[in-house]
């Protein structure tokens, strides 16, 4: 008998499985499929409800929760799509594509303007465009709109047209980066404490991003030898260094910014001002047309804090372990000179300047890029300086390979005009040249001089990729300035000087050379960065960084790395030279043995180290060795929590000092949809709030280490790229055994600074066999569906009311639906019995006309990317999800 029952089950499953396996079909039905219900060998074939399977591609009239895709690219995560009967063919239905949904399709403007609407303008008339069709897959809960590419705006694999950009939801945010360092000097038994931080407070209102940047510092020194004054001194400060707001203007491919800021320019030197700007945003362009960001490299002899500032404002701060470092995530909008400060835990400090001179200024033929600004200059303390100014610059792709660019900036007593030409030389690389002329009327008695002075500044840039030899040469930003040439920043300074002040740091000549080479035949990489600066009234400065890396194998040990790094930094009449040598040997899975040698004029050290990556979140390194002053010991530990990135470091130098450091970088985001503590990538930048209902500890991954939802089922993903098609997903390999991801993948293309929101779905609970009985003793028809209170489908009723249920919880109420509406409700026992596969008897109360039974406005179905698991006990009833093997 048991064998016969299993045979009947397999027959039922095969019939329904064949229908579901047909795949997505056009919403316009083809010839109906006739079912012979006697073939199913069911006692009461009149009770079967197979209407949803009877026509190939037919969708029953009603409303459904569906994912919407255009040519396989997701554009809407959870839309309510209404299917209506086609007046021209009563046997067919069509989906109502609303104006809001059609605006996301990415149609060219001239195509979208000609669309015809029906149902009082609420639905797109079907069959308007040749080749356009819709496909609905209820088993995957998706609606795919197929549109020929000729009707669509440009897009690529990771970039969407502006019509699909997401401005996000309203919310507030607080991002922070806090560094703490402690140092104990053995020679005087003194202690130093330093806590510094920076971050952003903000709010999003529609397309507007409101932001305020802050930075703070607290320093305390305790000298035990100064008994009378308790040997202590402290200093502290807190600054709100910038208040500003911005929004994207998609129609112009530009960003409008109001408030305080620094002049963004590819031609002129920057300065602080308050006002407004309208700037073409390269991030809004497809990825292959975007610009360049500065690259900062250096060497830390010990665990150190690296701070990058521009005109006093901190734009980057982080702790780095001993050895060479390279910072490549500076915002590409930063322009001008940057100041780098490396504070070693040993107490030593390195300082130097780097230039963000860009590669040759080229624009695609027919395109125009521009930057407009107006306002009043101001100092660090928000005080106005000088008069009202305006600034404008543009680059025009005049012909294939040629770009003309220039700009002007001025106020009442200062004007500057620039003109340049860029050329793509194809196989010979690319170059640009420009000249800037300045004219300034100086105030009487200025230390910079009297009267009107004029001067010129000349600049040239060159870049070349040598693909045949896998190398790149960039001669970026050669610049020569005449003695009387004056920047706007220098002119502003003339209004604040005193009679004893002299003009310092007056640039004469500067150039930066960067070269990288990969010698693949011998597994060697070379990188050179050299900067030379001369001044009219102070000594020259030179800095260079040379790195050679070699990768090789020895016997069964593979991936050995040998690196030599030489550097020189000159700043404020001081020179710092050094060589750093490192050898890294893999030692099993995720473990490495290393040797590090640091050699300079004032100190030499040799260390051996051990590194281990414990898991995706934890790694540490321990080093021990000897320096000129004695033994050394240091360690570094990093933990990537869901709520913050945490770095801990410690150093010991025999007879000299003991030190430690702590860095915490994180943020908090709060919206009407919920909020969470989280890691941060860029202060005040874009983020994606993921909502999985009330499920805690659900792993969500973007492009880096996964984060886990908090107690409220929320997580914030910060590793998202502006104007890219980002994808996040639930890591199903880390889900508990009683959890199943129903909606596990989401996509979003966010504008800069947006707080995106996506709902994902996890079904948690026990699995059980049940038997549903109606009030009159009968059973629901075959094919009836069972939902929970969150409208998640838990199972499909088989013969005799049997149903295999997943995701059930004690005391939960279940809704049983057929014929397009909820017919009755059943309650699960609390607590659930120990043996859930013996068959739960579930009385179903109510009928179509009773108060307990209500017709749902929408019909949630199986969601996109349903994940399935294999169960040890196979159900003997038709399930809404088939276990995989």
Model-predicted regions and their roles:
Residues 2-9, 15, 27-290, 602-669, ...:
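Post-signal-peptide, soluble extracytosolic/periplasmic N-terminal scaffold domains
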Residues 142-147, 360-364, 744-765, 829-864:
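Extracellular beta-sheet/turn segments enriched in Thr/Pro/Gly and aliphatic residues
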């Amino acid at each position: 008998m048991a064998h016969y029952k299993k045979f009947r089950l397999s027959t039922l499953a095969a019939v329904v499985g064949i229908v579901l396996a047909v795949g997505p079909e056009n919403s316009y039905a083809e010839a109906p499929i006739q079912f012979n219900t006697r073939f199913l060998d069911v006692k009461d074939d009149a009770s079967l409800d197979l209407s949803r399977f009877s026509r190939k591609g037919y969708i029953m009239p009603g409303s459904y929760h569906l994912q919407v895709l255009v040519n396989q690219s997701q554009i809407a995560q959870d839309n309510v799509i209404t299917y209506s009967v086609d007046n021209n063919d009563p046997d067919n239905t069509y989906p109502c594509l609303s104006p809001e949904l059609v605006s996301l399709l990415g149609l060219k403007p001239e195509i979208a303007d000609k669309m015809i609407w029906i149902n009082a303008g609420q639905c797109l008339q079907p069959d308007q465009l040749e080749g356009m069709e819709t496909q609905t897959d209820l088993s995957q809960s998706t609606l795919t709109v197929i549109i020929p590419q000729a009707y669509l705006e440009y897009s690529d694999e990771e970039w969407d047209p502006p019509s699909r950009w997401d401005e996000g939801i309203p919310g507030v945010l607080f991002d922070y980066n806090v560094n703490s360092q402690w140092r104990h000097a053995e020679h005087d038994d003194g202690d130093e404490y330093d806590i510094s931080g920076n971050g952003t407070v903000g709010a999003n209102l529609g397309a507007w991003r409101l932001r305020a940047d802050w930075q703070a510092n607290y320093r305390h020194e305790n000298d035990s030898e100064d008994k009378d004054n308790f040997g202590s001194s402290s200093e502290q400060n807190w600054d709100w260094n910038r208040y500003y707001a911005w929004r994207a203007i998609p129609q112009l491919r530009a960003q409008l910014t109001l408030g305080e800021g620094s002049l963004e320019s590819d031609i002129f030197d920057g300065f602080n001002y308050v006002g407004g700007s309208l700037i073409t945003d390269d991030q809004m362009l497809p990825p292959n047309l975007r610009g360049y960001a500065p690259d900062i490299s250096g060497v830390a002899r010990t665990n150190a804090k690296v701070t990058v500032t521009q005109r006093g404002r901190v734009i980057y701060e982080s702790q780095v372990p001993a050895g060479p470092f390279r910072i490549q995530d500076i915002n590409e909008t930063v322009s001008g000179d940057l100041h780098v400060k490396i504070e070693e835990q040993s107490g030593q400090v390195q300082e130097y300047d780097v230039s963000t001179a860009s590669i040759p200024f080229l624009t695609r033929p027919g395109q125009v890029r521009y930057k407009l600004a107006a306002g009043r200059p101001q100092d660090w303390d928000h005080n106005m300086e000088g008069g009202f100014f305006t600034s404008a610059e543009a680059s025009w792709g005049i012909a294939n390979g040629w770009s003309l660019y220039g700009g002007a900036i001025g106020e009442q007593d200062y004007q500057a005009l620039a003109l340049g030409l860029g050329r793509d030389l194809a196989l010979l690389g690319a170059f640009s040249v420009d000249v800037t002329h300045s004219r300034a009327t100086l105030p009487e008695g200025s230390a910079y001089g009297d009267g009107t002075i004029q001067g010129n500044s000349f600049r040239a840039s060159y870049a070349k990729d040598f693909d045949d030899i896998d190398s790149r040469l960039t001669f970026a930003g050669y610049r020569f300035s005449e003695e009387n040439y004056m920047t706007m920043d220098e002119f502003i300074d003339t209004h604040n000087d005193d009679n004893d002040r002299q003009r310092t740091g007056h640039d004469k000549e500067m150039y930066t050379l960067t070269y990288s080479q990969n010698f693949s035949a011998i597994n060697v990489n070379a990188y050179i960065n050299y900067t030379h600066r001369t001044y009219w009234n102070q000594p020259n400065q030179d800095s260079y960084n040379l790195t050679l890396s070699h990768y090789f194998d020895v016997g069964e040990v593979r991936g050995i790395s040998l690196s030599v790094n030489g550097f020189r930094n000159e700043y404020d009449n001081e020179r710092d030279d050094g060589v750093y040598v490192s050898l890294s040997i893999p030692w099993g899975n995720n473990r490495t043995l290393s040797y590090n040698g640091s050699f300079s004029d004032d100190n030499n050290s040799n260390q051996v180290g051990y590194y281990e990556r414990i898991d995706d979140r934890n790694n540490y390194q321990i080093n021990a060795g000897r320096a000129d002053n004695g033994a050394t010991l240091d360690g570094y530990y990093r933990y990537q929590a869901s709520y913050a990135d945490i770095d801990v470091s410690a150093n010991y130098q025999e007879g000299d000092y003991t030190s430690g450091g702590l860095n915490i970088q994180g943020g908090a985001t709060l919206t009407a949809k919920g909020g969470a503590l989280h890691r941060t990538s860029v202060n005040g930048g874009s983020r994606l709030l993921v909502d999985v209902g009330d499920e805690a500890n659900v792993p969500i991954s973007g492009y880096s280490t996964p984060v886990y939802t908090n107690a409220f089922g929320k997580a914030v993903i910060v590793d998202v790229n502006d104007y890219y098609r980002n994808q996040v997903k639930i890591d199903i390999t880390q889900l508990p055994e009683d959890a199943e991801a129903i909606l596990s993948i989401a996509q979003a293309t966010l504008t800069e600074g947006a707080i995106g929101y996506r709902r994902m779905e996890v079904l948690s609970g026990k699995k059980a066999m049940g038997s549903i009985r109606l009030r009159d003793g009968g059973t629901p028809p075959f094919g009836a569906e069972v939902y929970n209170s969150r409208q998640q489908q838990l199972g499909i009723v088989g013969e005799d009311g049997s149903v295999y249920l997943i995701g059930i919880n004690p005391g939960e109420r279940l809704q049983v639906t057929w014929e397009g509406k909820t017919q009755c409700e059943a309650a699960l026992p609390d607590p659930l019995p120990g043996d859930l596969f013996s068959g739960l008897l579930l009385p179903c109360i109510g009928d179509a006309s009773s108060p307990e039974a209500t017709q749902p406005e929408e019909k949630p179905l199986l969601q996109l990317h349903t994940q399935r698991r294999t169960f040890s006990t196979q159900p003997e009833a038709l399930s809404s999800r088939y276990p995989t093997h």
